[in-house]
Amino acid sequence: MSDIEEKAAINSTEVVSKSSEDKITFSEKDVQEIYEAQPITSIKSYSDQQVWHLLKILKYDDVDNLDDLPGEVEFLGTRVHEITIEESLEIMKEAVEYHDNDPNISAEQYEEFIRYSTEGVDPENEVDVFELKALAVLLRDHSPYPEVRAVCPPPMMDDPTIPIETFRAYFFAIIWMIFAAGFNELFSHRMVTIAITSSVVQMFLYPMGTGWAKWVPCWGFNVRGKRFALNIDSPWTDKEQMFCTLIISICMGTFYTSYNILTQKIYYGSKVSFNYQFWLSLCIQFLGFGFAGILRRFVVYPAKAVWPTSLSTIALNRALLTPEDPNLKGLTRYQAFFLAFGFMLVYTWFPSFIFQALSTFNWMTWIAPNNWKLATITGGVSGVGINPIASFDWAVIGSTSLMMPWFSQATQYAGSFLVILICIACYFTNYQNTSYLPIYSNSLFTNQAEVYKVDKILTADYKFDNDAYQKYSPPFYSAGNLVCYGSFIATYPFMITYYLIMDHTMFYAAFKEYFVTIWELRKKEAWVSLWNDDARVLDQFKDPHSRAMARYREVPDWWYFSVLIVVIIIAVITIEEFHTNTPVWALFMSIGFNFVFLIPLAILQATTGVSLGLNLLIEMIMGYALPGNPMALMIIKAFGYNIDGQADSYVSNLKLAHYCKVAPRALFRGQMIMAFLQIFINLGVINWCVDNMKGFCTPEAKGKFTCPDIQTYYNASVMWGGLGPKKIFNDVYPILKWCWLIGFLLGVLFGCAKKFGGKYFPVWFNPVIFLVGMLIGPPYGLMYYTPPLLMCFFSQWYCKRYHLKLWERYNYVIAAAFNAGLVLSQIIIFFSVQYNPKEINWWGNNVPYLGQDAEGLPLKNIADTAKGYFGPAPGHYP
């Protein structure tokens, strides 16, 4: 028996008896004795025909010889012989039920599940029996998803004795959290943002961790039998690095409180004390954490919650720390990573500095630069960007295009293309006077086609001034913005009605569990059960990853509930104590919205890679509920949006830990510590910038630190909190209020059609993804969506279908390498040639900004109108 086979046997946790109805669970000792009595057969014992058939089952059409087999084939070859026909058929029946409407399972594979579960198998047909057993073993002991198999070894290979929560892991995590969180906070307020990503951190953690393990002495002390030491007598492991990466990564996203603090300080002139900043940040930072515990059962434990856009983190971790078979042909993952990283580190200089036309490749406008219609339709600067070859810049293409499922990317693009066509139709028919404005601008405009200056309708204390408003102008949207807002409004009711129809059983069970749990808390027994650390929440999940994770102590629900309850109490006190003019019921309303939307949004992201926030929904609802109160709107928006954003960030980390077998309690402690420390780092950066950077958040700021994100946040607070959605929906753009009804009716239509006429739709088609694609809006035209589509087609469709072996080995590693190379190159470019601007003045840098595309002129000239403006007359504005 080989080392791998012996380890697989020892680590297995469940053996199923010959009878499919009599499942017996054995201890690890029993399992070891069984396998020693019946040794696992090596792949070499199979005939060439059987091995080729196994390759065919796993879709390895690109394997041309049997001397270079993928690891999955080797693994399955040691397991197929031990499973019975009866057990295999039982697994097929469970797969048919579980993977129904699973978009990440191909129709061909699902039909195989159905065929075996309904027709059975002829025991005399050795080929069919072999295929049945291979599929069953794949489901029982590995994963049916190539994406997961590409980055995760078989779960039974896990070694739970590997140390994870070490001093050196926490030391590196704190150091990198300070640097990454501070850097990302600073550069998030720059005109062109730069952000350190987890792939960059991983790349540096590897030499730091291995060096520490090799050279730092193992000095330490014992406390009650537990050893605390600077170092341990063990190499730096992949589990340690993954633990370290995960607790750092939750601190590298958007620190949403900064929007509130900077808007209040800079635009509203408020004196914001550090106490207020800290307690508000604490609430916003941890409220999503409490909800993450609820989401675990829906988007962490289930196998179908793949989280495709997060898998490159695991791939890079394995490439750096898991040795590969030296007999495999081609580059190792380690070599491929650094080769791709070096290439992108150099290449980024061309679209970012040397040859900027590669970034905005509006080549069709170069043919006729003064053709206004050509620039409007195909341009990438001010046009809608219908261009088949729009960019060669990886910052535009993005590593997500290598990870997003093809069905998801294509469906989104179809929605984006449709909304661009609607935008063009609205513009050229002058719908709502949009022809007097640029077609695709994210600015607000006056009735004289000038950029709207929000401060002109505010009093000295930043409140809405109706007299000034009547003299100035209502705000008007460009065609692109108008269609985008309509799509946003329709998406929320569509999503709820569609998912309630398609998955009403799951949602009923989820909400029933919520309310029953809360109701049962009136009993003493419920509190005792809630505090029970031995609750086995994974017992109901039978996939191999969940069975392997059952060996670790799970975080009990009461840990998450405690965080949630404490943070809500602190939030109420903060809102009241600091006189924010925000009613407490508004806080609970925002929590309620997340209570309704959080599960479908998380499931959408976990299965398709598509994300959607609640910021616009919160803005509109709170604008109606709290008219003329922009400060309250900003606070409730921060709570309402960040609950979902933070919860998704936490549970995606939990899923990666689930894949990599990182102890849940260790991750919980690490996440809590890092999220708390991050508050001080980000607040320190924010306040330092305001006090020490001359012109920070103004057009005169050096290094382009003009805070466009804060400007947008401020504008939204005035438009939705000061002016209010009632004026916009009822009078300026009445069509927008009907988008709620349109979304609801379309949700019912598509939900019923998919539910009762599913045979007419492909399994992967999800109309919610189509609507999310329709949320494309200025300033990002179709040119930002076409290059990712082409790259996704090449990676997720062509390579995955015809070169699966190479795709599994390199795809996610290259995605991580390109991301790391891009970020580091952007940092070098900024400090070397952009902070103190240096330019190369030549055709390749100038041509994108010559001609009509750069001008952004409207179809109609407001000066040609008799009144010199459009819409209602001054003094009669809605």
Locations of regions flagged by a protein language model:
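Alpha-helical multipass membrane-protein architecture
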Residues: 2-878
